[in-house]
Design a protein with these regions (language model features):
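Hydrophobic N-terminal alpha-helices or hydrophobic patches in metabolic proteins across all domains
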Residues: 2-530
Length: 530
């Protein structure tokens, strides 16, 4: 018999053995995953919808095909393993389900999406076992990058880009006047908006960098080093990109870098930087591991799990996954029932010299989801004027939430208003008192100083993450999900002297009255049995 015949015979025998090991496990795990995706169809739909509408996350369409290709690339290694169901996967599904329910209760979409990925891991481990999951560790982990996340990085990246650009311009000898994310140079005015943050470049670079590192390097330190470079390089490059665009416009008397060429220069520069990064990274590529996944000798067959064993674990996994959405439906029915009673929020009574004023302080309004009840009321005390915005939410759902990424002081590229700065103020009313978020807005006619925070279950909360956790805990414990946004607004003229003292005085004088107005809404809900 020739060497070719021997090779064919060995390959045929290996394929037959692999099929014997996987003949029940493979269709079972595929079927279970399809059912899990069907159970979480709304979560799957939310992921795909974001891929479709956002260029930042459009690469998500490629993640699943890449994951399948990576698993296929490991088929020989997987073929010599014998799948064995594992209760660890079911335990992981319990944790993933609880995580999903918390995301549902808090209306945090990214938590539900991450929980779905964790559920996929749990199903794979429950049906195929830890050894098989270990062999698919990178493809399963890479699936996390299909989840559209990273927008939380936009504000700090915008701040970094503004800092870098201003310093670079000053280093170039150009005088700069900066106010928040806006800055002026002799040739014109500029602002750093979300599109300038570089988050799109960062996410794209990180995704490709992780894949490149796994395929190119065998040593862990090389992989980690390249992934770190794929994060650091685009952040620094984005600072240079913004600086170069401003310089091109400045040196061309604003003839260039203001229209579509603004984006062309940016993408060309980013593409060049990424090309250089991966070109340099290729010099340290490790040789591909040519060793056989089966070793030098024959691999003994481990006892195969019978069909009923795979079916039992698949049923347990599916039941565990389905339990959490069923409980969520129960909570949803309660929420719908409680939303039937209309709410009224009366203006807080004036106190300590502050009186209600019918003259509007400003035409500005926060860009918030429609509340269950709300008001915008102006108060005066001598020559001091402050407006109060209260928004009361209950039975919250998408499009009607207290805490949402859509809830902002102004939308990006607002035709009239600009956000020129935002910061945390600790102990706004004195040591040990509440913390507030301070925002400065400007328009051609007016400047506003705004303090805002959340009121949930009688507690003043500043962090949106803590607010989400509190709302989720209240909802899961059948205490409802009511909460309020509180904003105090004062006008001013001099950007160097914002009316901080006026807001502090107003809050000290009027908070008992504001608390009473919100407490009356809470009492009305309790009286109605909700």
């Amino acid at each position: 018999m020739s060497d070719v015949d021997v090779g064919v015979a060995v390959h045929s025998r290996d394929s037959s053995a692999a099929w014997h090991r996987w003949r029940y496990a493979l269709p079972t795990v595929v079927g279970a995953l399809i059912i899990v995706l069907a159970i979480h169809a709304s979560t799957v739909e939310s992921i795909v919808a974001i891929w479709w509408r956002s260029e930042t996350f459009a690469h998500g369409f490629l993640i699943v095909p890449i994951v399948l290709a990576l698993i296929w690339h490991r088929r020989r290694r997987l073929g010599v393993l014998t799948p064995h169901p594992d209760w660890l996967g079911v335990l992981l599904l319990v944790g993933a389900g609880a995580f999903w329910l918390a995301g549902y209760a808090g209306e945090v979409l990214v938590v539900r999406q991450l929980a779905l990925v964790a559920s996929i891991w749990g199903v794979v481990i429950a049906i195929l076992g830890r050894e098989v999951a270990q062999a698919m560790l990178f493809p399963l982990g890479f699936l996390v990058l299909a989840v559209p996340m990273g927008e939380v990085l936009i504000p700090p990246l915008m701040e970094w880009t503004a800092d870098f650009t201003v310093v670079a311009l000053q280093f170039s000898g150009i005088p700069v006047f900066r106010e928040g994310l806006f800055f002026s140079i002799p040739s014109g005015e500029w602002s750093i908006v979300e599109g300038c943050s570089g988050v799109r470049y960062l996410i794209a670079s990180f995704t490709v960098g992780v894949l490149f590192a796994n395929l190119s390097y065998r040593r862990l330190w090389k992989r980690l080093l390249f992934v770190a470079a794929s994060v650091i390089v685009p952040i620094i490059a984005n600072g240079f990109r913004a600086y170069l665009i401003v310089m091109i416009a400045h040196l061309s008397d604003n003839r260039l870098a203001h229209g579509i060429d603004h984006f062309i220069y940016g993408w060309f520069f980013f593409g060049l930087v990424m090309l250089l990064l991966f070109w340099v990274g290729s010099f340290w590529r490790d040789a591909e591991d040519k060793s056989s996944p089966v070793g030098d000798g024959p691999v003994p067959d481990a006892p195969a799990t019978p069909r009923v064993g795979f079916a039992a674990y698949a049923a347990a996994a599916i039941a565990t996954v389905a339990a959490w959405p069923l409980y969520a439906q129960h909570l949803e029915r309660q929420s719908i029932a409680s939303a039937q009673t209309p709410l009224t929020l009366a203006a807080p009574a004036g106190a300590r010299g502050w009186v209600l004023d019918s003259d509007p302080l400003t035409d500005w309004r926060p860009h918030y989801d429609p509340p269950s009840a709300g008001l915008f009321q102006t108060y005066r005390k001598g020559d001091k004027v402050v407006a109060v915005y209260l928004a009361y939410y209950r039975s919250q759902q998408r499009g009607a939430q207290l805490v949402s990424s859509w809830n902002v002081m102004i939308v990006q590229k607002h035709p009239v208003w600009n956000n020129v700065g935002q910061e945390r103020v600790e102990g706004a009313l004195g040591s040990g008192t509440l913390d507030v978020r301070e925002t400065r807005l400007r328009s051609p006619q007016q400047r506003l100083l705004i303090w805002d925070w959340y009121r949930i279950s009688g507690h003043d909360i500043l962090s949106p993450y803590v607010a989400k956790l509190t709302l989720a805990a209240d909802k899961l414990s059948n205490r409802g999900d009511a909460g309020s946004a509180i904003m105090l607004v004062a006008p001013y003229d001099d950007p160097t002297h914002p009316p901080t003292a006026v807001l502090r005085e107003f809050a000290t004088d009027m908070m008992p009255s504001i608390d009473g107005a919100l407490a009356r809404v809470d009492a009305a809900l309790i009286a109605s049995g909700q």
